[in-house]
């Protein structure tokens, strides 16, 4: 039997994560991570803290890490995080939606509204 090695990620004083799946997708040029985060006694971890922890653990630039989803179990202090680490900025721009990129960097993405032009 082969033993699966799980990587631990220190996120903050009150939160620690275990990488359950680490998939290297060479076709797209990214690394896909599935992380189980334990934050018992504290709130859900922030995207910014997750990005910093992943980038430092994997030696990646913070602007190449995208948090796809954080799902927190009610009352359990456990979250499941889905993240991608891209090889370059161009690939990230091609595959990730702009709202996710803006969400992770803290930038506001301008949406259509009253002032938006209508297609005719």
Swiss-Prot record:
Stretches that traverse the bilayer: none
MF term (GO), any: structural constituent of ribosome
Species of the source: Sulfurisphaera tokodaii (strain DSM 16993 / JCM 10545 / NBRC 100140 / 7)
Gene Ontology terms: biological process: translation
UniProt keywords, alphabetically: Ribonucleoprotein, Ribosomal protein
Disulfide bonds listed in the record: none
HAMAP family in the record: Ribosomal_eS24
Protein name (Swiss-Prot/TrEMBL): Small ribosomal subunit protein eS24
InterPro entries: eRP_eS24_sf, Ribosomal_eS24, Ribosomal_eS24_CS, Ribosomal_uL23/eL15/eS24_sf
UniProt record similarity statement: Belongs to the eukaryotic ribosomal protein eS24 family.
GO CC term (a single one): ribosome
